[in-house]
């Protein structure tokens, strides 16, 4: 019963409002509330406890304690500084190693490029997907001719040979001359399978050559960044391209 009376009394009590900053003190900023004071007080208390712990640690320090890090640290102006260790690899050696890496990758890329050229010459790469397809445009005078247009009839060849861009004989040539090479279905399938296998190999080699080219560019970019010339990054590094930097122009002697 008492709880019910307390709730009823709260519903009728005056609404509590925090005091705001007076008008003549607006230039001093917002009036500090209790929550602001609490944050400031907690921060001050935390710092005091940290200083107290440091003082206690300094008083309890053992003058005979030893750490292995002390052998490579020296005290200079009250600050601990790690001694400089001897370089196992000089910058010139590192630059030479990276140059050899670039040369090796470039050698592999050139080898892949030569294999690609050899495969292209063997396959007579005229209808390869990676190559830009040529367009054959036909012109007509009326819409009726466009609707009745048939590519095989216009080119005077068999419908099966329309998609070819090379070795597309006419019907009269097929009727007059004897077909050379394999004519049975099994032999044709075997030749088509071998040809497709070579095209797949060529596609893989082209992709590998592109990846090697990108890797060589990235290593070369890292080698160029070793120069102390002032530089600005223009483009970030991506999977398919290295980062691009603009170097400060320097007059050559």
From Swiss-Prot:
Subcellular locations according to the entry: Nucleus, Nucleolus
One GO term (biological process): rRNA processing
Keyword rRNA processing in annotation: yes
Molecular functions (GO terms): RNA binding
Modification Phosphothreonine, positions: 90
Listed Pfam families: Utp11
Taxonomic superkingdom: Eukaryota
Gene Ontology CC: cytoplasm; cytosol; extracellular space; nucleolus; nucleoplasm; small-subunit processome
Region of interest called Disordered, as start-end residue ranges on this chain: 1-26
InterPro entries: SSU_processome_Utp11
Keyword annotations of the record: Isopeptide bond, Nucleus, Phosphoprotein, rRNA processing, Ubl conjugation
UniProt keyword annotation of NADP present: no
Family note: Belongs to the UTP11 family.
Subunit composition and interactions: Part of the small subunit (SSU) processome, composed of more than 70 proteins and the RNA chaperone small nucleolar RNA (snoRNA) U3.
Protein purpose: Part of the small subunit (SSU) processome, first precursor of the small eukaryotic ribosomal subunit. During the assembly of the SSU processome in the nucleolus, many ribosome biogenesis factors, an RNA chaperone and ribosomal proteins associate with the nascent pre-rRNA and work in concert to generate RNA folding, modifications, rearrangements and cleavage as well as targeted degradation of pre-ribosomal RNA by the RNA exosome. Involved in nucleolar processing of pre-18S ribosomal RNA.
Protein name: Probable U3 small nucleolar RNA-associated protein 11
Organism listed in the record: Homo sapiens (Human)
């Amino acid at each position: 019963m008492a709880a019910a009376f307390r709730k009823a009394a709260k519903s009728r009590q005056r609404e509590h409002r925090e005091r705001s900053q007076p008008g003549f003190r607006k230039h001093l900023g917002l009036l500090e509330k209790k929550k602001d004071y609490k944050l400031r007080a907690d921060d001050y208390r935390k710092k005091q406890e940290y200083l107290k712990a440091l003082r206690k640690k300094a008083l309890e320090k053992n003058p005979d304690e030893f750490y292995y890090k002390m052998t490579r640290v020296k005290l200079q102006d009250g600050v601990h500084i790690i001694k400089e260790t001897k370089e196992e690899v000089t910058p010139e050696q590192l630059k030479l190693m990276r140059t050899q890496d670039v040369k090796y990758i470039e050698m592999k890329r050139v080898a892949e490029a030569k294999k690609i050229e050899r495969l292209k010459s063997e396959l007579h790469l005229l209808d390869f997907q990676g190559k830009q397809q040529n367009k054959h445009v036909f012109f007509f005078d009326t819409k009726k001719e466009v609707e009745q247009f048939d590519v095989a009839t216009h080119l005077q060849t068999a419908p099966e040979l329309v998609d070819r861009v090379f070795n597309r004989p006419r019907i009269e040539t097929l009727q007059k001359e004897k077909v050379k090479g394999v004519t049975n279905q099994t032999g044709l399938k075997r030749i088509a399978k071998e040809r497709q296998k070579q095209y797949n190999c060529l596609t893989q080699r082209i992709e590998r050559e592109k990846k090697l080219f990108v890797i060589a560019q990235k290593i070369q970019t890292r080698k160029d960044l070793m120069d102390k010339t002032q530089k600005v990054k223009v483009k970030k590094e991506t999977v398919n391209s290295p980062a691009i930097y603009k170097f400060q122009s320097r007059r050559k002697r």
